[in-house]
């Protein structure tokens, strides 16, 4: 039975067509019936994934083609979700590497491919978007070969099969000049080159939990690949955690994937990827085995977090007006629940019961969590993201990242100046036929906080930016990543009025418009100078009973800046917070009253002296 199973992971950079290709594989294999609704981007189930066009959680699907069953696991492309990638590799026997026929391999591709090689998996390379204007498949294949050599691939991994596809047109072929009007060449390549799982169906049952899900009806759902034996509903099992502790349990239901549905089955066989219910308090990496076969599998290793933030209860004067969940207990419960399946996330309580330290793989990793909490109705405050330093042989070290910037030629000077200020080290420059320039840099992770926002503004939204973790090296003492300008701070609570805002415009750039409710200590704009300025944005025009002589100035407000969550996080300094509610994102000073801020500054200066 297990000879007809193929378990493969899909690796692709953001926007190289991974999800669209999966849609075609599902539809052309007949996994979807004619009457079923066919949506685009089927695999991206989370609202944020659909909006941003990125995959955050790894997901499973299964395709029946002829007598074969192909289990496909979708992996996130971002290094920020590396915790997801690690677990996927432990479930599969081969990887499908999807690369854009024009762009070639990118840093995120490199990150996941490196993990795949670490697990000894052989790639099947899919050159997608072959229908793109100016596509250059031969150049892309050379780039992929160079990438594999840099990643220390073995001879078998370097001798990779290549399939050309256009996911949007539903065509594929082994020669890009002779494409078939279907996906059959790709199905055949998967069956031929992906090995059947190396499992033993005759031994006693054993599997490792690689993913967790939760359902209100079924409770905790553990997902993994059966390493040996088989499993049926109501079987008694033993759970062994990563520390070697054991406890008994009983399987309730055994579920299998078909298309995007999870269906109940009467027996799960060796080599297949299944889901089980009935076992509470499961953790990633737990081994589930037969009571007569207490043999734990090696625990999965997850990359350490690189970024830390503080989440706290909303203490602003507007607390509780817009959200449902506002207490420290509710926030902590939600964060603890997130750590069950989001294993790269670490949550610690601090001395203050209202503040929690949250560490993750990157700015994006944490901002996705905050955005999800916000949509669920939470109110909270968060601090500026900080890089986690390491002490190695008593030397303070910080993480560095490889970044690739794809920009138009006219922006090159400004971008190089901008990265020079952030102490970036230029590694390579290439110019492509479309007069776009690709710059490769080595840059401290500290310098990357707030980088994306500034980069997009310099390139007028036309630039592409990718980063992946490189290594730790000696900490360089400098103030990169800190904002140079001060801010405009409201001196009282009330409604901002156009007359006051009009007079403040010459002082800086405003973050709100007429009629917005503000409170004392809220940041309402960016000052033109380097110091903070406390201002009054509530004063209306003084009215008299004298008739106006027609000399009144027309009050015209310039468009104010509205922050997204990521922009707000990267904008604030260490003495500021972002207040997040389901309806608003506000910036504020940590100390709302001006005399408290002055006292805190004096104390800080005394400590430095």
Swiss-Prot record:
- Localisation per UniProt entry: Cytoplasm
Q: What is its main location?
A: cytoplasm
Q: Name one GO cellular component term.
A: cytosol
EC? 3.6.5.-
Where GTP binds, per the record, is at: 15-20, 128-131
InterPro entries, from UniProt? BipA (IPR006298), BipA_C (IPR048876), BipA_GTP-bd_dom (IPR047041), BipA_II (IPR047042), BipA_III (IPR047043), BipA_V (IPR035651), EFG_III/V (IPR035647), EFG_V-like (IPR000640)
Keyword terms: Cytoplasm, GTP-binding, Hydrolase, Nucleotide-binding, Ribosome biogenesis, RNA-binding, rRNA-binding, tRNA-binding
Which GO molecular function terms does the record list? GTP binding; GTPase activity; guanosine tetraphosphate binding; ribosome binding; rRNA binding; tRNA binding
Annotated family:
Belongs to the TRAFAC class translation factor GTPase superfamily. Classic translation factor GTPase family. BipA subfamily.
Q: What does this protein do?
A: A 50S ribosomal subunit assembly protein with GTPase activity, required for 50S subunit assembly at low temperatures, may also play a role in translation. Binds GTP and analogs. Binds the 70S ribosome between the 30S and 50S subunits, in a similar position as ribosome-bound EF-G; it contacts a number of ribosomal proteins, both rRNAs and the A-site tRNA.
Protein known as: Large ribosomal subunit assembly factor BipA
Q: What is the lineage of its organism?
A: Bacteria, Pseudomonadati, Pseudomonadota, Gammaproteobacteria, Enterobacterales
């Amino acid at each position: 039975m297990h000879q007809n199973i193929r378990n493969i992971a899909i690796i692709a950079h953001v926007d190289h067509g991974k999800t669209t290709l999966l849609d075609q594989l599902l539809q052309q294999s007949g996994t979807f019936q004619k009457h079923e609704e066919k949506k685009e981007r089927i695999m991206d189930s989370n609202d944020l994934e659909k909006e941003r066009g990125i995959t955050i959680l790894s997901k499973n699907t299964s395709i029946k083609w002829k007598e074969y069953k192909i289990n496909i696991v979708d992996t996130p492309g971002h290094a920020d979700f590396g915790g997801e990638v690690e677990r996927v590799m432990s479930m599969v026997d081969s990887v499908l590497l999807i690369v854009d026929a024009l762009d070639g391999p990118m840093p995120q591709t490199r990150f996941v491919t490196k993990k795949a090689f670490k697990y000894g998996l052989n790639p099947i390379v899919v050159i997608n978007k072959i229908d793109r204007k100016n596509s250059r498949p031969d150049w892309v294949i050379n780039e992929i070969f160079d990438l594999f050599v840099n990643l220390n691939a073995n001879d078998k991994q370097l001798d990779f099969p290549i399939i050309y596809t256009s996911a949007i047109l539903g065509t594929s072929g082994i020669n890009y000049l002779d494409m078939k009007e279907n996906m059959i060449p790709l199905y055949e390549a998967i069956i031929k080159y992906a090995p059947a799982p190396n499992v033993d169906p005759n031994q006693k049952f054993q599997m490792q939990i690689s993913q967790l899900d939760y359902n209100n009806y079924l409770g905790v759902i553990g997902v993994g690949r059966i390493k040996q034996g088989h499993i049926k509903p109501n079987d008694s099992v033993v759970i062994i955690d990563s520390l070697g502790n054991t406890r008994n349990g009983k399987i309730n239901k055994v579920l299998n994937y078909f298309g995007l549905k999870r269906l109940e089955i009467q027996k799960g066989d060796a080599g297949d990827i299944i889901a089980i219910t009935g076992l509470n308090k499961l953790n990633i990496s737990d081994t589930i085995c037969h009571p007569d076969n207490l043999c734990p599998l090696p625990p999965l290793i997850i990359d350490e977090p690189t970024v830390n933030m503080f989440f706290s209860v909303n203490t602003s004067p507007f607390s509780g007006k817009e959200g449902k969940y506002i207490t420290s207990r509710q926030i902590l419960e939600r964060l603890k629940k997130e750590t069950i399946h989001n294993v790269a996330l670490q949550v610690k309580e601090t001395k203050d019961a209202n503040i929690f330290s949250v560490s993750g793989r990157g700015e994006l990793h944490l901002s996705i969590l905050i955005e999800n909490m916000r949509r669920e109705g939470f109110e909270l405050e968060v601090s500026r993201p900080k890089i986690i330093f390491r002490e190695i042989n008593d030397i303070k070290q910080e993480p560095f990242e490889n970044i690739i910037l794809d920009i138009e030629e006219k922006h090159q000077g400004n971008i190089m100046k901008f990265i020079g200020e952030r102490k970036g080290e230029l590694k390579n420059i290439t110019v492509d036929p479309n007069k776009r320039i690709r710059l490769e840099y080595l840059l401290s992770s500290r310098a990357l906080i707030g980088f994306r926002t500034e980069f997009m503004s310099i390139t007028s939204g036309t630039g592409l930016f990718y980063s992946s973790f490189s290594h730790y090296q000696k900490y360089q003492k400098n103030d990169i990543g800190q904002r140079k300008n001060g801010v405009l701070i409201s001196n009282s609570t009330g409604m901002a009025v156009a007359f006051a805002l009009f007079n403040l415009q010459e002082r800086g750039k405003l973050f709100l418009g007429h009629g917005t409710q503000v409170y004392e200590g809220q940041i309402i704009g960016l000052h033109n100078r380097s110091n903070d300025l406390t201002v009054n944005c509530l004063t209306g025009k003084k009215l008299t009973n004298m008739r106006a002589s027609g000399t009144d100035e027309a009050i015209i407000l310039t468009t104010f800046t509205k922050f997204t969550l990521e922009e707000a996080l990267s904008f604030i300094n260490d003495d500021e917070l972002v207040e997040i509610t389901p309806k608003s994102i506000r910036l504020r000073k940590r100390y709302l009253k001006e005399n408290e801020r002055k006292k805190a500054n004096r104390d800080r200066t005394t400590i430095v002296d």
